[in-house]
Amino acid sequence: MTRPVIVALDLDNEKKLNELLPKLGKPENVFIKIGMELFFNEGPAIVRNLSRQGYQIFLDLKMSDIPNTVYNGAKALAQLGITYTTVHALGGSQMIKAAKEGLIAGTPVGKNIPKLLAVTELTSISDDILHEEQNCNLSMNQQVLSLAETAKKAGADGVICSPLEVKNLRQNVGDDFLYVTPGIRPAGNAKDDQSRVATPAQAKEWGSTAIVVGRPITLATNPEAAYEAIKKEFN
């Protein structure tokens, strides 16, 4: 089975989206991540339209609220034809459980229920921030493991984590869980605003289920060639 490489579309309007997408290849061969910028500017209709065109979609809104609100939000998102969506693991087990129930309730008959991924610690969070700003006494690996265990028990299908943490998670949480990893930079690329990064080959070696890559693809001279090269390296 081919491991997905998901293109992070850090764009804020449909015009930029329409300029980029044809450069990535045929819709059925492209897995995209839509975040807050595009969703908040263009609304749910753009997600539904892209799904109908054949794109696989990771809708990354990182929901975090009281369980009832998250249930209703997830129920609405499940109607858009997405493959993955996210909540913050720090929202707790009841919220994660509510999100999963909302996705199940909202998915149209005959369609696949979107996979629920819980965000552990953002890849922009360093050990210093974890300890000094979040007042967490655990190591990064311990904190991520604790959040992943909570998410799995609450019904999440997987987690968003750094590739550096996947090996430890697989050993302790199991292989029957998705490990989707941003913070991917091909060799020679700048880290930008990411703190905990790896190459596609390292992510493969350490056991990532899927990787999320943005600027190394979207800002490349030939985005489709860059995308295909990263797919090859990861698979």
Swiss-Prot record:
Q: Quickly give the catalysed reaction.
A: orotidine 5'-phosphate + H(+) = UMP + CO2
Choose one Gene Ontology CC annotation of this protein and give it.
Answer: cytosol
**Subunit structure and binding partners:** Homodimer.
Q: Which residues bind substrate?
A: 10, 33, 60-69, 123, 185, 194, 214-215
Upper taxonomic lineage: Bacteria, Bacillati, Bacillota, Bacilli, Lactobacillales
For this chain, one GO molecular function annotation is: orotidine-5'-phosphate decarboxylase activity
| Example GO BP | 'de novo' pyrimidine nucleobase biosynthetic process
Q: Which UniProt keywords apply?
A: Decarboxylase, Lyase, Pyrimidine biosynthesis
HAMAP family documented for this protein: OMPdecase_type1_B
Q: What class of enzyme is it?
A: lyase
Q: Does the keyword Lipid metabolism apply?
A: no
Family the UniProt entry places it in? Belongs to the OMP decarboxylase family. Type 1 subfamily.
Q: Which organism is it from?
A: Lactobacillus gasseri (strain ATCC 33323 / DSM 20243 / BCRC 14619 / CIP 102991 / JCM 1131 / KCTC 3163 / NCIMB 11718 / NCTC 13722 / AM63)
Which pathway does the database say it acts in? Answer: Pyrimidine metabolism; UMP biosynthesis via de novo pathway; UMP from orotate: step 2/2
Q: Which SUPFAM superfamilies match?
A: Ribulose-phoshate binding barrel (SSF51366)
E.C. number(s) listed in UniProt: 4.1.1.23
The entry's active site is 62
- Keyword tRNA-binding on entry: no
Q: What protein name is recorded for this chain?
A: Orotidine 5'-phosphate decarboxylase
Q: What does this protein do?
A: Catalyzes the decarboxylation of orotidine 5'-monophosphate (OMP) to uridine 5'-monophosphate (UMP).
